[in-house]
Structures are given as C-alpha cells and as structure tokens.
C-alpha cells in the first residue's frame, strides 16, 4: 500500500496537491491535461522531486526522505534512458549493480529478463543496433530485473506506432500480473487506459485526485 498523505509537491511556481492511496497489484493510469502535473506526481513518488509538505508512506512506513534508489519502485521513461556506449547486457545490469560487477547469479537474472521480454541472443548488442521497439524492451528488462513492487511509467511508449505500443502495453501488463507489481502509468491516450488500467488518477487544477475505476470514468469522462 502506497499513500501520499496531504502532500504538496512544488516545482517553481507550480504546486500539486495529492492525498491518495494506491493498492498492490493494480494498474493505475494517470491522465489529465498537458502541464497538469502528471509527471510531477511520478517524480515525487520516485523521490526526484521532494515534497513541500505531507508524507509518502509505504506499508505504513514513512519513506518521504528516502533516496530514490531506496524506494520500493522503479521508473520507465519515455526515452528509455539507455546508455549508447553500453551493451544490452550492461544496460539491464545497471538495474542490479551501478558498478556493473555482476556475479554469476546476477548475470543469470539479466539473461532471464531479456528472454522474458523477447530479446534472446541480443545481450551483446548496443542500443544503436536495435529498433525502437527493441530499445523499449531493453528498458523494460531493466525494470523487470529489479523486481520492485511498484513500476512507474512516464509515457514510455509514446514514440511507438499503435500496434507496437499495444504490444508493449500488453507485455508490461502481463509482467506486472506475473510479479504482482502495481503499475502507475502516465498516458494521454484513452485507448491505453481502456486496454490495461484498473483505476484512473485524474490530475487537473493543481490536484491529483484519488483513484477511480477506469471503466466508469472512461464511460463518463470529466
């Protein structure tokens, strides 16, 4: 259970208010107008943006001051955040050890993650040798290998075509179901919400509203 308790998140002159609770093993779509604060919300959850006030609780424990790497979550970015000079194996391995000194067991975990996202035999390639969809799969493998209970996605597949984006959404949803991770996904696409979301967090007017059932909200949008 992740709770933002009467939180204020400030970036420059913008302040976002949030008072909400997220349950395990659910998929949340974060929607709202451009500039409403959707990415700001994810940044605060991950620890990239400090709370001005309020608390962030995980399973009842206050993690407001925890460093990003010490939080029970990982994030998948729109640009995949891959290092061009590193191999696929190394890019995924960063999720386990930033110094890339991977032991045998850790190397096995990386290969298993690559296999699970359909990148068998590509561990030695560089990102420039991969298609856009394959690069997205490398980034997803790095998320998978960390085995965190919360996965945050900031429009990670926005640059992909509709068919490939749907494939990636289905893969993310399947992996989350297997690992019982909660997904929190920023999206501008209503079809993405309908495809995989259980709940919707609507962000507008400086407020991230508590989750609502996705089907009901999409049938009666605000």
Across the structure, where does each feature detected by a protein language model lie?
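Helix-to-loop junction immediately C-terminal to a conserved catalytic motif
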Residues: 46
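ABC ATPase NBD coupling module
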Residues: 62-79, 98, 103, 107
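Short coil-to-helix segment of the ABC ATPase nucleotide-binding domain corresponding to the Q-loop/switch region
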Residues: 86-95
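Conserved ABC ATPase "signature" region
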Residues: 104-122, 173-174
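A short, proline-enriched helix->beta-strand linker immediately N-terminal to the Walker B motif
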Residues: 145-149
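Catalytic Walker B motif of ABC-type/P-loop ATPase nucleotide-binding domains
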Residues: 151-155
